[in-house]
Every structure is written in structure tokens, then in C-alpha cells.
């Protein structure tokens, strides 16, 4: 019985099996990184929702006047921070600063605030899988 090359064949088979194991390990690491990034984005979204809620609580007159009833998009900076803002200007600044931070922290990040009269709904939306469509969101309700 000739066994020439049999050991080489065993080594090649072991190498193929080992290669599949390494590929599976690499896929596991990539998936773990994806889940970690997703959790980070959700944490940022939660922090951002609480940020605008705190800004709203700090500007009671702005809430009473309805200045926070429909925040969406990036808005504009009213330029009054150094000179003193009215409650309406402060609400405008809060919306601008908040959505600027959403865009900086989250991929395709944006936020909106809506109300049904007594309850404010704060929504932070971002593109979690980076396919171009903002498809993940964090919703928080606030009753000031």
C-alpha cells in the first residue's frame, strides 16, 4: 500500500477547514461591530431626544406660546445667544442646535417635535444600515 502524498492531502484538508473557521470568525467580528455601532447610534439618539426635552423644559414660556409645536429640519440660527433671546428665538435656536447635533452625531440624522395639544412627541431618525434611507428612529413622549 502506497501512502505517498497522503500526509500532504491531510494537511491541505486541515488547511481548508481552518480557513473556513477563520472566515466564520471574521464574519462574527464584522457582525459584532455592526451591532456595536447600531447600539452606539441608538444611545446617541436617546441622548439627543432627552437633550431637546431638557431644552423645552428650560424654556417654559416657549412651550406655552407654542414655539416647540412643530420642530423639523435644520432651521436657522437666530443669532441671539450673545445678545439675549426671546422665548420664541430660544425655541428656534434650540431646534437649530438640536438638529445640527443630530446631523453631526448620527448618519443622516434628523429630528422632529410634534404635539397633540398636551403631549409632545420627539422623534430622532437616522440611517442605521447606511443604505441612504433613514430607516431607524427613537421616539420619546414628553408632557411638560
Describe the role of every protein-language-model region.
Residues 2-50:
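Aliphatic-rich helix starts adjacent to a transmembrane/signal segment
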Residues 13, 37-39, 46-144:
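Flexible, low-complexity segments enriched in proline/glycine/serine and punctuated by aromatic residues
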